Amino acid sequence: MSLLFLTICLITMNTLVIFDFTKEADLKNWDVINDTVMGGVSAGKMGKDAAGNGLFEGHVSLDNNGGFTSVRYDAGKIKLQGYSKFIVVLKGDGKAYQFRVKTNKSESYSYVYSFETTGNWQTIEIPFSSIVPSFRGRSLNMANFPGDYMEELGFLIGNKKEEHFKMAIDNITVQ
């Protein structure tokens, strides 16, 4: 066997797919949460583009003290032992977003990692050790994401300005 083949096998064996967007992928466990829960008027939606990629898009408004929209995926309990980072393949719009993950979906806080998009397809690598606990934009005095398991993940845009946004997502894995 060639060294290249063995390397590919080893890399693939240590990758767990959390969600792979395809034309057939069901979005029933993806929910949009807008700032309307707090009186705002921002509007985001989750769908698919023509290629089958996940498409999180909409408009963030600052009216009525709003300013964010988010999408969450209820993944069920997934063990993450043996992995050290999330990998997200996406195409953004040049804006800043947050990747958010919860160990227990009923917890009020999330673990958050902020990233910038380029407007091109890119691979975002998110080390578990860099995902920080946060509640409503405030850092918490707790350890960073432990990486034992997760139940929910998602994305949030809230850059303290009114803006349209659009982010396509190909897949989310852990390695």
Residue ranges and their predicted role:
Residues T12-Q175:
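Beta-rich carbohydrate-recognition modules and glycan-binding surfaces
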